[in-house]
């Protein structure tokens, strides 16, 4: 009978390593693609094709979800209305594009920490749109996260004002991304509650709609041709973009697996741990400077996330 706990422990290890390795490498690839300089001398340029990058990511995610449905959910019928998927996909892709675009103005630790604050918009939108009620511990955890972010973002005045505008623009993009993440979360909660939408069907349909919108966008704006020209000049980036998209899709699969077998609490702890070490790796590998007060803010944010994962779920709807 001891084989059951052993197999459960092995499965947890596989899920942990899957999430950790996929998203750790995903973070390194994202920073490599968006923040490095391409070319030499006066012909140096940066990657500025956030729409095209997310388009490739959505295509790979959709293909991966289709494969998962064929393998595990082939007998299940999805009854979710298409307009819900299309509406959700707009906030979903907007959040991803804003997040990737923000990396042109802020460093990766700032982006990761900003994206770690999802509980804030989810809670605010839950209270205002869905009239949800949360326990006091949830509000205290969110306050701790807000205080940590405020410490991280605090910059004492130095005599020069250079770069203030770009940093502010990057932070606005992160704020937009967080707001859209919150709207996506509210939409997904509605679909699960009213249509019992499965995670693989949701992943497939949202990414298909996102691919459709983005495909039209990059063709109409002409970004597609500039993106293809850029990949022709620097073919090595194609390898990084494909790996970036594959690690994203595979990482989502391990997250869903963790939620199914071990619940959202374990998944939250794993993803929170992963984000902290991603920031640490970014500081070491890409020499992103972080002051001591920013480290304090970072620790407070992850402490708030950990406490929220453990104690902030006290408000459950009664089961019938």
UniProtKB/Swiss-Prot annotation:
Key words of the record: Endoplasmic reticulum, Membrane, Sugar transport, Transmembrane, Transmembrane helix, Transport
Motif position, Di-lysine motif: 316-320
GO MF entries: UDP-galactose transmembrane transporter activity; UDP-glucose transmembrane transporter activity
Membrane topology (UniProt): Multi-pass membrane protein
Cellular component, GO annotation: endoplasmic reticulum membrane; Golgi membrane
Coiled-coil region: none
Ribosomal protein keyword on record: no
InterPro entries reported for this sequence: SCL35B1-4/HUT1
Localization, UniProt: Endoplasmic reticulum membrane
Described function: Probable sugar transporter.
Domain notes: The di-lysine motif confers endoplasmic reticulum localization for type I membrane proteins.
Similarity comment: family membership: Belongs to the nucleotide-sugar transporter family. SLC35B subfamily.
Protein name in the entry: Solute carrier family 35 member B1
Organism: Xenopus laevis (African clawed frog)
